[in-house]
Amino acid sequence: MLLFQDLRKDIYEIVSKRFRISENDVYLDDTGHSDITIRVFRILKSPDGGENAVMEIVRSISEKDYVEKALSEGGYINVWIKRTYMLREVLESIEKSGTYPDVFQEAERVSVEHTSANPTGPLHIGRARNSIIGDSIYRILSRYGYRTVRQYFVNDSGKQMISLYTAYIKYGGPITIENLLENYQKIYREMEKDQSIEKEIEKNIERYENADPEVFGTLRKIAGVMLDGIASTLKRIGIEFDEFDWESDLLLNGSVRKAIDMLETKEEDSARYIEISGKKVFLTRKDGTTLYFARDIAYHLFKAENSEWIIDVLGEDHKDHAKSLNHVLKEMLKLENRVSFMYYSFITLETGKMSTRRGNIVTLQDLVDRTYDEALKIVNEKRPDLSEEERKKIAEVIASSAVRYSIIRVSAPKPITFRWEEALNFESNSAPFIMYSHARAASILDKAPEPEQSYGMDMPKEEADLVKAMYVYPYYLKDAAQDLKPDLIAAYLISLVQKFNDFYGACRVIGTDPLTYARRIRIVKAYKQILSDAGDLIGIKMLDQM
């Protein structure tokens, strides 16, 4: 939990002592008119309310030592917070704990499962959105104080993986990503002409579920090689996992059969199924082999043993699956754990859907490589004074951060189109724009002598606006954690940087009087810390020089 005084909650409690309102009726005013706004339309219209009641609320709020003023304005109460209070809260936290806001660890354990792509090929950019959202949620919840674990469910038992194994046995060659992918694409082309291949795959599925050592051992090697390729690409953009949970382990240790037996199943041609909203949902095939839905139930029961809150990041095409899964967990199995499904829209291309089976894909590796090449051109142009090695390191960090920011800044349910000219724009709404501001702050601090202990409090508008932008950081962090909305952090970062740029243009830091300098240098230090902290939540790595 974040250690800060949430003034929204404080003000909500003042109002709710007399009137029934929603916590959502008290919110940050992002218009710039005031700092906190309260909707009071219902209070004005209620029998025991009216204008006098609203004015009484205004007086109660105005008595708080952090309030500059409070006004009733057309169905709203607008509240202005003292900038001296805001600055003190930020600086005291940073000077005491080294960070703003400080935090203590929650007892609640959280599982964040993301990516979980079949290890049948490289990660395409549509699926990479899953990884970037999931990792950002993990970072946000960890920063908030939850004990969070990153999990990847390795689907090494499904039909696609058995198809990959069958292709390897059929066409041979080394167990390398290139050869396995070529064989995989080949078998799907051949399957369109030769229906007997389908029967081969079904036979191998049965052998696998019966723990045939030859099938199991070879397939584990194949899956491991493909998974290493996915993991190494994700690591390039700062994404790693705490656990790789293998689907086959749940089959071999009996967890899947146990999960099926916990349900009241019916049979049709020897295949077992359950009914959800009048529809049949099959758990096994007629030959007794299990289907993915059954294995996913078992996996969620496994996660529930170690986590009070289970979060799945899923493509929008998995909504029906998730709805059925949630029904099984909550209505049939009475699982008490909190379960959240976060859906996202895919990144689409003009060439249509991306499919590993047919080889028509743009991979995450392709995207990062191209972004790196474009970033390196810009760095070479702007910083010829640096060594080639330094320019390459900067370009790599810019590329990783640019890819992540360009994807995370768009709300998850909305479709996205990646454009390099936007991702690498140093002038607005991009990772380089944010990173350059951090480097600018670092440059000021490099030249700054040690300030006086005391500092003045008379601030011009640009400075006061920056103080407010820093102060509200924990509000955005709290909302992003509770609502699972990492795009809120992306929006906050841009707003914060814009306020710093206004401050930088209007307010001299070095060369002012001692009290003003002492305050402003502390503000710049605090800004640099908060910017770095918030950037890390969505995978932006800051640089001291660009």
Curated annotation (Swiss-Prot):
GO CC aspect terms: cytoplasm
GO molecular function: arginine-tRNA ligase activity; ATP binding
Keywords: Aminoacyl-tRNA synthetase, ATP-binding, Cytoplasm, Ligase, Nucleotide-binding, Protein biosynthesis
Class of the enzyme per the UniProt entry, highest EC level: ligase
Subcellular location: Cytoplasm
CDD domains: ArgRS_core (cd00671)
Taxonomic superkingdom: Archaea
Catalyzed chemical reaction(s): tRNA(Arg) + L-arginine + ATP = L-arginyl-tRNA(Arg) + AMP + diphosphate
Pfam family, one: tRNA-synt_1d
Motif position, 'HIGH' region: 117-127
Enzyme Commission numbers on file: 6.1.1.19
Biological processes annotated in GO: arginyl-tRNA aminoacylation
Family the entry assigns: Belongs to the class-I aminoacyl-tRNA synthetase family.
Protein name: Arginine--tRNA ligase
Organism listed in the record: Thermoplasma acidophilum (strain ATCC 25905 / DSM 1728 / JCM 9062 / NBRC 15155 / AMRC-C165)
Gene encoding the protein: argS
